[in-house]
């Protein structure tokens, strides 16, 4: 790639005063933490909070610990956008869009309607028609947000606290879809390109599914395991109301079983007891599921962009929220994640990989063999590492070895997928890149960063099914993946890359792909990086706020 075309140069020139190739810089000349607009805001806010709420107990003090600002406190460019922000604005606690990304995933549950309809028709002799389905959908939209049905004298939830809660329906049956109230329909034909729509409808068949969006506030106050229970309770009550059933009817137990267990698709699997987490929590969300949650394949034909948007969503969800908070209990994982979705660095490496593949093999132009994995991963890894050698500013941007290891390996895996359409080959490209990188620099990042990479290739081809699961079926709790930051979001992007190369309508689940195409969602899953930028710039309007029940100010 010609030097002037390198995608990361614009960001480097904006971030640093020196030429990106300059080998020398200054220290302790930037004004310490006061060089940062956000740090100055934090200090001012701290003084106000101390005066009004802390009873003299200290809070924020940037002069404690390692002195901030001896180096440039650099801004970040959100990759694929023209937006710049400070690093603090990408911490999930400071970014409403990243919070909403997780809220919108956690508060979702997909429920099959056919079992309940079968109970109505076969056990109770009640006819199910498009008209009765529409009536039920009207009822569930009242109940799901906290409205009372069946019983009187019941307390209800203020609509302003639950405006983001609703239920919609989708089906692969065009005739039925045409008769349903369009307000409740997730219309596959309108939301997806024609070829994708046909593939999705074929996968779904004549079945009908409800997508429940529980209020964001419920997930925050309770947990992901609450979501299906909240949904199931309101589904049962809404069936009783819409179909005028007796609440004590024995068949209602079947509604309960279907909506809580038999016909429920959670976003995340329940985790082992030692993780202390139920379903619909980040550690149980498989990489293929996250690939289908992200919707870039609907709006862009660029396979690299499709893959990188999944990487960004995964970096925020898995690295920042799951590993950075749930698992470690700290605040320090943000910049592991941002390395993968800022400053167009991974973009540059990945487009180099695609260019190399298209010239040598053609997209989807070769079989998945170790020779192909070795060729592409070696080429892309060496290109990536050479950029760090040539541009010291790039090295300063990715100041941690594990940041560099993650993006070089991710681009290698994406490149292998572009050539083969095979996610297992792609993840082996990642593993090879890590090993090459370690040979190049003697180490990668913190001790143990490369634990999974040393055994990954043999695991991916193992006989034991817990180790050899296809990449799409793996997740944060897969053996050896549990506590190594700077991997999981990239794995999800590699899984997507294989399906992007193939032109598939979905990676793992047609149901998830359709459910998250819903334009009523608060977070736009077709452009996660743009949404993160809006959150960083404080332009994102999130759900789940409590202003209506707080004192007026």
Swiss-Prot record:
Binding-site residues, coenzyme M: 336, 447
EC code: 2.8.4.1
Pfam annotation, one family: MCR_alpha
Cofactor note text: Binds 2 coenzyme F430 non-covalently per MCR complex. Coenzyme F430 is a yellow nickel porphinoid. Methyl-coenzyme-M reductase is activated when the enzyme-bound coenzyme F430 is reduced to the Ni(I) oxidation state.
Binding site for coenzyme B: 229, 260-261, 274
Oligomeric and partner information: MCR is a hexamer of two alpha, two beta, and two gamma chains, forming a dimer of heterotrimers.
Similarity field: Belongs to the methyl-coenzyme M reductase alpha subunit family.
NCBIfam families (alphabetical): met_CoM_red_alp
Function in brief: Component of the methyl-coenzyme M reductase (MCR) I that catalyzes the reductive cleavage of methyl-coenzyme M (CoM-S-CH3 or 2-(methylthio)ethanesulfonate) using coenzyme B (CoB or 7-mercaptoheptanoylthreonine phosphate) as reductant which results in the production of methane and the mixed heterodisulfide of CoB and CoM (CoM-S-S-CoB). This is the final step in methanogenesis.
Record-given protein name: Methyl-coenzyme M reductase subunit alpha
Organism this protein belongs to: Methanococcus vannielii
């Amino acid at each position: 790639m010609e030097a002037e075309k390198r995608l990361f140069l614009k960001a480097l020139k904006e971030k640093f005063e020196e030429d990106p190739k300059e080998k020398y810089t200054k220290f302790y000349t930037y004004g310490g933490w006061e060089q940062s607009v956000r740090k100055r805001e934090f200090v001012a806010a701290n003084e106000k909070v101390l005066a009004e709420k802390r009873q003299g107990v200290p809070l924020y003090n940037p002069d404690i610990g390692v002195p901030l600002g001896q180096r440039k406190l650099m801004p970040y460019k959100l990759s694929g956008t023209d937006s710049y922000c400070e690093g603090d604005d990408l911490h999930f606690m400071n970014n409403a869009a990243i919070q909403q990304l997780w809220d919108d995933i956690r508060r979702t549950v997909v429920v099959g309607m056919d079992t309940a309809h079968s109970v109505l028709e076969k056990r109770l002799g009640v006819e199910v028609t498009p008209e009765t389905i529409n009536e039920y959908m009207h009822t569930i939209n009242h109940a799901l947000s906290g409205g009372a049905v069946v019983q009187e004298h019941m307390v209800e939830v203020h609509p302003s606290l639950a405006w983001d809660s609703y239920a919609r329906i989708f089906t692969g049956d065009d005739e039925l879809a045409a008769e349903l109230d369009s307000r409740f329909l997730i219309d596959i034909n309108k939301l997806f390109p024609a070829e994708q729509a046909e593939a999705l409808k074929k996968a779904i068949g004549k079945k009908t599914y409800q997508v429940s969006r529980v209020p964001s506030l419920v997930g925050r106050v309770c947990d992901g395991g609450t979501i299906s229970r909240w949904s199931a309770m309101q589904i049962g009550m809404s069936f009783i109301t819409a179909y005028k059933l007796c609440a004590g009817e024995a068949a209602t137990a079947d509604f309960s079983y279907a909506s809580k267990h038999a016909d429920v698709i959670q976003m995340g699997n329940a985790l082992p007891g030692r993780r202390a987490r139920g379903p619909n929590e980040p550690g149980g969300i498989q990489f293929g599921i996250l690939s289908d949650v992200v919707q870039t394949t609907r709006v862009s034909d660029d396979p690299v962009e499709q893959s990188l948007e999944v990487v960004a969503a995964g970096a925020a969800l898995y690295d920042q929220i799951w590993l950075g908070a749930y698992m470690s209990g700290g605040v320090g994982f943000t910049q592991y994640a941002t390395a993968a979705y800022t400053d167009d660095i991974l973009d540059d490496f990945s487009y180099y990989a695609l260019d190399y593949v298209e010239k040598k093999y053609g997209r989807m132009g070769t079989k998945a063999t170790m020779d192909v994995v070795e060729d592409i991963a070696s080429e892309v890894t060496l290109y990536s590492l050479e950029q760090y050698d040539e541009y010291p500013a790039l090295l300063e941007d990715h100041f941690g070895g594990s940041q560099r290891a993650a993006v070089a390996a991710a681009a290698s895996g994406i490149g292998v997928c572009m050539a083969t359409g095979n996610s297992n080959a792609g993840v082996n490209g990642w593993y090879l890149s890590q090993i090459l990188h370690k040979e190049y620099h003697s180490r990668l990042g913190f001790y143990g960063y490369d634990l999974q990479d040393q055994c990954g290739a043999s695991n991916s081809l193992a006989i034991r099914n817990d180790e050899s699961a296809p990449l799409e079926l793996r997740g944060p709790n897969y053996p050896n993946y549990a506590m190594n930051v700077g991997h999981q979001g990239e794995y999800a992007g590699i899984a997507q890359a294989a399906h992007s190369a193939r032109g598939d309508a979905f990676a793992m689940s047609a149901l998830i792909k359709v459910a998250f195409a819903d334009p009523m969602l608060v977070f736009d899953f077709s452009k996660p990086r743009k949404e993160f930028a809006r959150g960083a710039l404080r332009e994102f309007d999130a759900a789940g706020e409590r202003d209506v029940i707080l004192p007026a100010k």
